[in-house]
Every structure is written in structure tokens, then in C-alpha cells.
Design a protein with these regions (language model features):
Chain B
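Helix-to-loop junction immediately C-terminal to a conserved catalytic motif
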Residues: 48
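Conserved ABC transporter NBD signature motif
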Residues: 56-64
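Conserved ABC ATPase "signature" region
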Residues: 63-64, 111-129
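Conserved signature/switch motifs of ABC ATPase nucleotide-binding domains
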Residues: 133-136, 154
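Catalytic Walker B motif of ABC-type/P-loop ATPase nucleotide-binding domains
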Residues: 159-162
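A short, surface-exposed alpha-helical micro-motif characterized by mixed small hydrophobic
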Residues: 201-203
Length: 264, 266
């Protein structure tokens, strides 16, 4: 590329081309990472205590933030739903409206976003620091698979924790909706919960359940991958953490749209 | 016997290793020396299988490391010990758990047997009192000794040391060297020791290899390296500026004091 004219033309073209190439390369690496994680998930032995430890961290550790966000989401839904429904004289449907919104959409999505922010980022930072301080290399040198010790337990814990946290989010959200709609605005408990059970069925619960499982897998996949492949130093780890949170959040929303449109 | 043959490795188009070759005989410890940033740690990580070469081969008793299946590589690694530059202790575990970890995961020993072996190893490295401490609570020297205990707990046949004394004071450096020497005599492992502690490491290694510009430029006994005619090697081990640079500086109008240039260290 000695010719200056050639340089002027080729350099921008190469820069443009590098973006999709990097993107495709990263997709491939993420795909291989997932394949390896799945392989070790089904190849015994399973590190049971590490799974429990991660469930404690991802699941139990996120309960407070899930309860708080669930309560306030339900309360906001109670307010907004009541004033919207009162315009058409249908405040009796507040219960079904709050329940269906939470069970099918808001519960799985918001719970997953909260877990991404609280636990996903921490998983990425922990793996990134372990990568930088050669702790992951130390595992490999001992003849132990980092996937079996670090990645698979996080995957399983996330798959178990996120649906349970979503369930907590839904229950607290429905109660929050009742607190506002019922206690403050006067919808009776019988109407609120009676109409809810009439309109929200098991299919709605299952729809949210399937979504939350997918989101749990997504969070673990992205967080572990970004941490495992984190760059050098504090900057590398902080960039990996930011990317993990942003990518997980975006993928959760895209996945939610796809699941809603194709499956339910 | 470890044979490293014509190793090449590039990172982002920069060639770090350009055909490095080395042989380590059974029971020998080879000190790998050379200027910073020349790829000594990269070389060591290839020997351990943590990095794959672009080309070249690594043989253990005739077995090609690059041609091994994953299960064979895992089996081979159980014969390895690796002392990382910063220790690489698991920071969520105590010193005791760090040292016990390889035994718990790779052997069928009872917890009582593991305890006996771990305490004996910690005693050997002078950390009997620190078993309940976490890596963050250890000094640099203690962390290195704990990492050494973890690396040696399964009596490896091959030990790789990546700058085990970097950032430590001279007394701790001496004690770590003594520890490596005594464990080498006790366990009889073969090994490669990346170090900048020249000439201290020459006191207990059998061979010295000099990595320069991506190739092993010199291999010989500690005595032979002092007698070599290779000016680059000679300048390096005497801590002088490279001969070429020195000649250039002698031609400039003002006289450059070499000791001043090196921060006043004689």
C-alpha cells in the first residue's frame, strides 16, 4: 500500500470492513464459548457446591433489589392502570391488567435487567480479575477446566435463580399493585384478585417462566464470556463489565421481543 | 527431558518468539534470562501449554505437546507445577485451601491426609502460622511462598517458575531462592526458571539460557556464561548497556557516565 491514493481509498474501506469482521468474529467466539459451557454442563462431575455458592450470590443476593423494584413497579402499575381504566369505567380489571403486565412482560424483563446490573456485572468483574491475575491460568495448569469450575456453576445458578427471582418480582408486584389500587384507590380485594384469576391463567405464568429461563442463560453467557475474555488491567476489566451489562440488557430486550412475537 | 524446538509466536503481527529452541535434561533447572519484554514468560507459557505456538514443537520425553488431545494434555499437566509471577493464588480461599485445592480436586486422599500434607508443605515454606490468612492479607514474599507450596504439593516432575522473586527485597529473594534450591534437591524436578536475579540464580541452577530477540542466543552452565565471548550476553549479565549503544555514546561530545545512566547503581 505504498501509493498514497491507494492508502487514502483503502484505509477507510478497511476500517469500515473491520467493524463487521470484528462483530462476526466475536459472535463466533461467543458461540464457541457457549458450546464449551454446554459440553462441561453435561460432562460430569458437576461442582455442586460451587453451583450452590453461585445460587446464593446471584439468587439470594438479588432478592432485596428484586423485592424493591417489584414492589414499586407493581405500585406504579396500580396507579397508572387505575387512572387509565377509570376513564373507560373498567377499574375492576385492574387486577388482570397488573398481573398480565407483570407475568408476561415486566416481571421477566425487569427482574433479568436487575440481575444483570447486580450479579452479571459482578460475575464479569470477578472473572476478569481472575483472568488478569492468572488465577484462570492456574486452574488450567492444575489440569482443571475453568469452564467446569467457574462458568458452568454460574450458568446453572443463573438458570435456576432468574426464574425464581422473576416469581418473587411478580408476587411482590401484584401485591404492590393491590396496595395502591386496593388500599389507596378503593378497588376491593375480591375484585382485584377475583378478576385476576379469571383472566390470568397458567399459560401466562408459563410464558413468563420460559422467558426468564432464556434471560437467565443470556445473562450468564454474556457475563461469563466478557469476564473470561477481559482485556488487561483495570481498564480491560471495567470495559468488559460495561460491555457485559450493555450487551446483556440489549439482548434481553431483543430476545423478549422475539419470544413474544414468535412463541406466545 | 523437555525439548523445545524452533518456537515461533506473534501477537497482533509482532513476532515475539522467532525460533526459540531449548533442551532441559531430567533433573536440571535451567535459568531463562534476558532483557524485559523479550518473551520469557511467553516462552514459559508455551512450555506449560497455556499458549499454542504459531509453529514449532514442544516435546516431553518424546511426546509432542502440540499434538496431544485435551485429555492427554490434562493428564500431562498433573505432572506440572507452575509458579506464576504474582502467585496467582485464589483470592477467595485461605492459604490452607489454596494449597489443599490441587489435592482435593485431583486426588482421592482423605481430608485428614490432605491436612497432613498441606501442613507439612506450609511448614517447609515457613508459612505454618499463615494457614488461615487470605492472599490479600499476605506480604509479597509470603504470597510467593504460598504459591510455591501450592505448586509443589503434588510433587511435580516439571516446575516452571515465572519470575518468582520480582518485587521482593533482597533477603526475601535469597530465601525464595534457597527454598527453590532445597525443594529441587528434595523432589528432583526438572524446571525452567525465568529470572532477572543475576548472578544470584546461577548459584543453584544447572544451566543458563539467554533469550534475546526471540531466540535462545546462549545455553551453557553458569560458569560458561561468564566466560562467553558473546558481547550481548556478557553485557547483559554484567548489567552494562549494550555494546553498540555504549560505543555510540562514547562518540557523543559529552562523556556519559554509565552508572549515572543506570540510576547510580554500580
Amino acid at each position: 500500500m505504498g501509493n498514497p491514493a491507494e492508502k487514502w481509498i483503502l484505509t477507510p474501506v478497511r476500517s469500515v470492513g473491520r467493524i463487521p469482521l470484528d462483530w462476526v468474529g466475536n459472535m463466533g467466539r461467543m458461540g464457541l464459548f457457549l458450546a464449551q459451557a454446554l459440553f462441561y454442563a453435561f460432562a460430569p462431575p458437576l461442582k455442586f457446591f460451587r453451583v450452590l455458592k453461585q445460587i446464593r450470590f446471584i439468587g439470594f443476593g438479588s432478592v432485596t433489589v428484586i423485592v424493591l423494584t417489584g414492589a414499586f413497579t407493581g405500585m406504579v402499575l396500580g396507579f397508572q392502570g387505575y387512572y387509565t381504566l377509570s376513564r373507560v369505567g373498567s377499574t375492576a380489571f385492574l387486577g388482570p391488567m397488573v398481573a398480565l403486565s407483570l407475568l408476561r412482560e415486566l416481571g421477566p424483563v425487569l427482574a433479568a435487567l436487575m440481575v444483570t446490573g447486580r450479579a452479571g456485572s459482578a460475575v464479569t468483574a470477578e472473572l476478569g480479575i481472575m483472568r488478569n491475575s492468572e488465577q484462570i491460568d492456574a486452574l488450567e495448569i492444575m489440569g482443571l477446566s475453568p469452564f467446569r469450575y467457574l462458568v458452568v456453576p454460574t450458568f446453572l445458578a443463573s438458570l435456576i435463580s432468574v426464574p425464581l427471582l422473576t416469581a418473587i418480582f411478580n408476587v411482590v408486584g401484584i401485591l404492590g399493585g393491590y396496595l395502591v389500587g386496593g388500599r389507596l384507590l378503593g378497588v376491593s380485594a375480591g375484585t382485584y384478585f377475583g378478576e385476576m384469576t379469571a383472566y390470568a391463567d397458567a399459560q401466562d405464568v408459563l410464558a413468563g417462566f420460559y422467558k426468564s429461563i432464556c434471560f437467565g442463560g443470556l445473562i450468564a453467557w454474556v457475563s461469563c464470556f466478557k469476564g473470561y475474555t477481559a482485556g488487561f488491567g483495570a481498564e480491560g476489566v471495567s470495559r468488559a463489565t460495561t460491555e457485559a451489562v450493555v450487551l446483556s440488557s440489549v439482548l434481553i430486550l431483543i430476545c423478549d421481543y422475539l419470544l413474544t412475537s414468535f412463541l406466545f | 527431558m523437555i525439548t523445545i524446538d524452533n518456537l515461533h509466536k506473534s501477537f497482533d503481527g509482532v513476532e515475539v518468539l522467532k525460533g526459540a529452541s531449548l533442551e532441559v535434561r531430567d533433573g536440571d533447572v535451567v535459568a531463562l534470562i534476558g532483557p524485559s519484554g523479550e518473551g520469557k514468560s511467553v516462552f514459559l507459557k508455551h512450555v506449560s501449554g497455556l499458549l499454542k505456538p504459531d509453529s514449532g514443537r514442544i516435546f516431553f520425553n518424546g511426546k509432542d505437546l502440540c499434538g496431544l488431545r485435551r485429555s492427554e494434555l490434562v493428564a500431562l499437566r498433573s505432572r506440572f507445577g507452575f509458579l506464576f509471577q504474582n502467585g496467582a493464588l485464589f483470592d477467595s480461599m485461605t492459604v490452607y485451601d489454596n494449597v489443599a485445592f490441587p489435592l482435593r480436586e485431583k486426588t482421592r486422599l482423605s481430608e485428614k491426609q490432605i491436612r497432613e500434607r498441606v501442613l507439612a508443605e506450609l511448614e517447609q515454606v515457613g508459612l505454618a502460622e499463615a494457614e488461615d490468612k487470605y492472599p490479600a492479607q499476605l506480604s509479597g514474599g509470603m504470597a510467593k511462598r504460598a504459591a510455591l507450596a501450592r505448586a509443589l504439593i503434588r510433587a511435580p516432575e516439571i516446575m516452571l517458575f515465572d519470575e518468582p522473586t520480582t518485587g521482593l527485597d533482597p533477603i526475601i529473594v535469597h530465601s525464595i531462592h534457597e527454598l527453590i534450591d532445597s525443594t529441587h534437591k528434595r523432589l528432583g524436578f526438572s524446571g525452567i526458571l525465568v529470572s532477572h536475579e543475576i548472578p544470584e540464580v546461577f548459584a543453584f541452577v544447572q544451566k543458563v539460557a539467554f533469550l534475546h530477540e526471540g531466540v535462545i542466543r546462549f545455553v551453557g552452565t553458569p560458569k560458561e556464561i561468564f566466560e562467553t565471548d558473546d558481547t550481548v550476553v556478557r553485557d547483559f549479565i554484567r548489567g552494562s548497556l549494550p555494546s553498540e549503544a555504549l560505543r555510540f555514546r562514547e562518540q557523543v561530545p559529552f562523556q556519559l557516565n554509565v552508572n549515572e545512566a543506570r540510576g547510580g547503581v554500580a
